[in-house]
């Protein structure tokens, strides 16, 4: 997990969860369970789901993305053609990207989405 958090800026989002019968269930967050190849692992084991800010995007319409989580914007950081969106979901801070033309404000409720191939199970050796 150290390497996943150490490399890249901004840091990789690390979302705590547990193995469940339908995949990884995220602690304290309203989100669909994330499909996983941990089906053979005892349910309830702790695991982290890592997703880089470059891969976590603000959705402005209905989406078929595998990972979707509702959050509230705390900070917006303009970066030219894109903006970094610092949002809170449950007790966890997440960093995502959005197009700089998007009309986003502090306090807005947003849906953050990512493709399945952008999700990384971290700490599986400890599961």
Predicted regions and their residues:
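ABC transporter nucleotide-binding domain
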Residues: 1-23
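Glycine/charge-rich catalytic "coupling/switch" loops of P-loop NTPases
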Residues: 16, 22-75, 102-124
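Short, structured beta-strand/loop micro-motifs enriched in basic residues and often containing a Trp
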Residues: 29-33, 90-96
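Short flexible coil/turn linkers enriched for glycine and charged/polar residues
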Residues: 8-13, 43, 79-81
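Short beta-strands and strand-coil junctions in structured, solvent-facing domains, enriched
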Residues: 2, 56-58, 94
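Short aromatic-glycine-enriched beta-strand elements
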Residues: 23-24, 80-86
């Amino acid at each position: 997990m150290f390497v996943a958090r150490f490399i890249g800026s901004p840091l990789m989002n690390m979302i705590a969860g547990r193995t469940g019968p339908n995949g990884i269930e995220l602690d304290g967050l309203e989100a669909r369970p994330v499909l996983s190849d941990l089906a053979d692992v005892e349910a309830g084991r702790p695991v982290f789901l890592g997703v880089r800010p470059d891969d976590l995007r603000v959705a402005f319409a209905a989406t078929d993305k595998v990972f979707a989580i509702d959050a509230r914007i705390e900070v917006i950081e303009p970066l030219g053609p894109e903006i970094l969106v610092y949002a809170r979901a449950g007790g966890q801070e997440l960093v995502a990207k959005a197009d700089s033309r998007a009309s986003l404000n502090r306090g807005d409720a947003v849906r953050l989405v990512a493709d399945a191939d952008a999700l990384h199970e971290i700490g599986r050796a400890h599961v």
